[in-house]
Amino acid sequence: MTKQDYYTTLNISNTASQLDIKRAYKKLAIKYHPDRNQGNKTAEEKFKKIKQAYEILSDTKKRNLYDQYGHSAFEQNNNSNNEFHSSFTTSTSDFNDIFGDVFGDIFGSNKKNRKEKGSDLQYNIILTLEEAVKGIKKEIRIPKLDKCQSCYGYGSAYGSKPSTCTSCNGHGQIHMRKGFFSVQQTCSTCRGTGTMIKNPCKICFGQGRIKKSKKLSITIPAGIDTNDQIRLNNEGEAGKYGAKSGDLYIQIKVKKHPIFKRDENNLHCKIPINFVIAGGSIILYSSFRGEITVPTLEGKINLKIPSETQSGKIFRIRGKGVKSVRKGFQGDLFCKIIVETPVNLNSFQKKILYQLGESFKNYKGENNSPKSKRFFNSVKKFFNNFTK
């Protein structure tokens, strides 16, 4: 049974932020929680799926594995002891956790020292079809703002430490009371970090990060396609003052192939075959052999061609397409036969074709070209009705 995509389960895109994931989970979990749907088995199953999707996508390491390999990343053991498939339990505290700090997420957190995460980066990789289908390792170099190794990203000079902000007492937030309401705002002095740097690092000038180029080894999974993304957690730009780094998104583009055209997990190719024509009749050159050689990404194979095969006929070769990067099944190869009209004929070849035409019951070869006969009969009938 095909499992639903975790992003689809939470009604979010695969580029959703952690905050978006958390909001989506809370919204759906509140709706389908068993405490609100007692006796409703459908809602209970839905809640299980929502909770499982959240457990994977809210964990950066698990999410990275899922983005690259899909459900198969968590099905290697295929048993109940799989660490990524926890048992289903519910409680009142679990229900309360869903509400938790939902308003804090939207209007500002009450947690101290929330530092701004570093920016996400994107790197474009162009692959050949063979590389995309079989998978490959690529070495790339990313220019970015990385953590300063002199101050370990905190911005203070060696031997000193950031001091607590006196404006917010290290909370990063300032509470302002207006009548009956208390409004929470980011501290303008420390910009929400909760700390102040009195003795800045001379290497990064107190920023906690410097410009550098970092070399990375990227594993491209087999079956990846154009517009797919690979997410590398914490490989984006470093955050200021020791904050968490952003993520790196590898954007995939597959080059056009001279033989094959890809359609999801299937491959398509056109195979030209010689023929002899006389009076509209077509005889495949391949009919004398019975089979032709067909290219695949795994090597050559033989394909039997029935006699009198017409141009445009498509043959399906199962299991010779692309293996799905997520679902694991193998696509097929579709070969379209293109009957090629011969050109540059000499007098001897023209004579043979003429003799072939003469061997038919009449020169038009209607018995050998039934489609042509039906077409011209329809044309004749059309003009007869047109002139009445």
Curated annotation (Swiss-Prot):
Participates actively in the response to hyperosmotic and heat shock by preventing the aggregation of stress-denatured proteins and by disaggregating proteins, also in an autonomous, DnaK-independent fashion. Unfolded proteins bind initially to DnaJ; upon interaction with the DnaJ-bound protein, DnaK hydrolyzes its bound ATP, resulting in the formation of a stable complex. GrpE releases ADP from DnaK; ATP binding to DnaK triggers the release of the substrate protein, thus completing the reaction cycle. It holds the Pfam family DnaJ_C. Zn(2+) 1 binds at residues 148, 151, 201, 204. This is Chaperone protein DnaJ. Its cofactor is Zn(2+). Zn(2+) 2 binds at residues 165, 168, 187, 190. Residues 5-70 form the J domain. Keywords: Chaperone, Cytoplasm, DNA replication, Metal-binding, Repeat, Stress response, Zinc, Zinc-finger. Gene3D superfamilies: DnaJ domain, Heat shock protein DnaJ, cysteine-rich domain, Urease metallochaperone UreE, N-terminal domain. Its main location: cytoplasm. GO terms for biological process: chaperone cofactor-dependent protein refolding; DNA replication; protein refolding; response to heat. The keyword Repeat applies. Belongs to the DnaJ family. Homodimer. PANTHER family: CHAPERONE PROTEIN DNAJ, DNAJ HOMOLOG 1, MITOCHONDRIAL-RELATED. Coiled coil: none annotated. The keyword Repeat applies. Binds 2 Zn(2+) ions per monomer. A zinc finger (CR-type) spans 135-213. Signal peptide: none annotated. It is found in: Cytoplasm. SMART domains: DnaJ (SM00271). The gene is dnaJ. The J domain is necessary and sufficient to stimulate DnaK ATPase activity. Zinc center 1 plays an important role in the autonomous, DnaK-independent chaperone activity of DnaJ. Zinc center 2 is essential for interaction with DnaK and for DnaJ activity. GO terms for cellular component: cytoplasm. One of its GO terms (molecular function) is unfolded protein binding. CXXCXGXG motif repeats lie at residues 148-155, 165-172, 187-194, 201-208.
